[in-house]
Amino acid sequence: MATTTSKTNTGYVTQVIGPVLDVSFPNGQLPKIYNAITVKGKNEAGQDITVTCEVQQLLGDNQVRAVSMSTTDGILRGMEVTDSGAAISVPVGTPTLGRIFNVLGEPVDELGAVVCDSTLPIHRPSPAFTQLETKSSIFETGIKVVDLLAPYRRGGKIGLFGGAGVGKTVLIMELINNIAKAHGGVSVFGGVGERTREGNDLYQEMKESKVIDENNLPASKVALVYGQMNEPPGARMRVALTALTMAEYFRDVNNQDVLLFIDNIFRFVQAGSEVSALLGRMPSAVGYQPTLGTEMGSLQERITSTTKGSITSIQAVYVPADDLTDPAPATTFAHLDATTVLSRNLAAKGIYPAVDPLDSTSTMLQPGIVGEKHYACAQRVKGILQRYKELQDIISILGLDELSEDDRLAVARARRVERFLSQPFFVAEVFTGSPGKYVSLEDTIKGFTMILDGELDELPEQSFYLVGDIQEAISKGQKLLAEAK
């Protein structure tokens, strides 16, 4: 959806190399860098072709080099190319909710055109220093393990690490649900270079869990933007900017708190690397593009809190060959405020969300930001879980009875803490049958402090499993004790 100017410049294709086109324009009528140009014509089979490209280089001799946003199959030399006079622009605002878009802002869910008053270009400057929110504040998610041990920063960036099948999608959907209910905010999901099947699964699950309301789309809580694995690298490189532009509108114009999901940030870097090679740039370390830091920075710096609203971004991070020193994840880490690590061991135990309490980190967990009470409680929880982890080998070889009295007590409380870190989700009600729970930070701290102080040692472990606040655990425990008599 590129806007057109009254005077259109027209050129013609001189060379096609995969997703990269060279186009010749009349003297003095060259398009600017990042302008959208459109190739229109018929292929050899007589079918209409419309391909939008983005200008990346001005080569001299009235030639420009552009990267295609869709397949270049059927494009022939000599085909007419029109300069739109502006960057790729996408629809923004409430009409985007509940819909799926491609990189150009065109709906791809077969639900008809999007009627939208305003569009915005995907290339925009990051907010000025004077517009930024200077105070660090916590973004409460209502998920106990996250809020207590690795709290999110309002307007911050969070890395989400986890393999297949440990609950990334369910956690993402719960966060989308909770921001809508607790903060009156909306979410934008950017699917960058991931599997089309996963994108379809996510869409279907969102409809099932009512995150997307099919009967009343504007009441949905999320807009989806997909540029999947089968797309050319130009689309995968720019789809994150399309999603971010939609999120910026909700922040700057609607003054809302927005969650922006990027799955997967590594694919954004990978697509940039492919485009860089196609444009003939000299590769940098490990074959990545020399502009890696600049590209990542221009995306990440737009994700921030302003005085009007905030964009909090949760980015799934794929670590190639589990090598954290690889330039792609290493560049990403420099921008992150918190990490949420999902553990297969916890998922195997049935503890959901399977967030690893010891591996997950946050720069917000400081007494000056979260307060002494929260900080002390979090450190005690981490301490007792670390002690339990250290004793695991002894327990598995010799059994619990061989431990000292103090260690046995620590293990008993750690097992209660571990179970209390689990929580029923609203979006999982469809599968589990148990109603979801949103737990305030105050209730979370109170609950864990009571367990650590030994006030609930008489309750069975099972009473802390998949409950909301501590009162629910106490009621469940008393019921279990009454049944056991």
Curated annotation (Swiss-Prot):
Q: Reaction(s) catalyzed by this protein?
A: ATP + H2O + 4 H(+)(in) = ADP + phosphate + 5 H(+)(out)
Subcellular location, record wording: Plastid, Cyanelle thylakoid membrane
Q: What PROSITE patterns does this protein's entry cite?
A: ATPASE_ALPHA_BETA
The record's top EC class is translocase
* GO MF assignments: ATP binding; ATP hydrolysis activity; proton-transporting ATP synthase activity, rotational mechanism
Cellular component per GO? cyanelle thylakoid membrane; mitochondrion; proton-transporting ATP synthase complex
The cross-references to InterPro entries, in alphabetical order and at most eight, read: AAA+_ATPase (IPR003593), ATP-synt_VA_C (IPR055190), ATP_synth_F1_bsu (IPR005722), ATPase_a/bsu_AS (IPR020003), ATPase_alpha/beta_chains (IPR050053), ATPase_F1/V1/A1_a/bsu_N (IPR004100), ATPase_F1/V1/A1_a/bsu_N_sf (IPR036121), ATPase_F1/V1/A1_a/bsu_nucl-bd (IPR000194)
Q: Which UniProt keywords apply?
A: ATP synthesis, ATP-binding, CF(1), Cyanelle, Hydrogen ion transport, Ion transport, Membrane, Nucleotide-binding, Plastid, Thylakoid, Translocase, Transport
* Recorded topology in the membrane: Peripheral membrane protein
Q: Name one GO biological process term.
A: proton motive force-driven mitochondrial ATP synthesis
| Protein purpose | Produces ATP from ADP in the presence of a proton gradient across the membrane. The catalytic sites are hosted primarily by the beta subunits.
What family does the entry list? Belongs to the ATPase alpha/beta chains family.
The protein's name in its UniProt record? ATP synthase subunit beta, cyanelle
Q: What organism does the record attribute this protein to? A: Cyanophora paradoxa
Q: What is the lineage of its organism?
A: Eukaryota, Glaucocystophyceae, Cyanophoraceae, Cyanophora
Q: Gene encoding this chain?
A: atpB
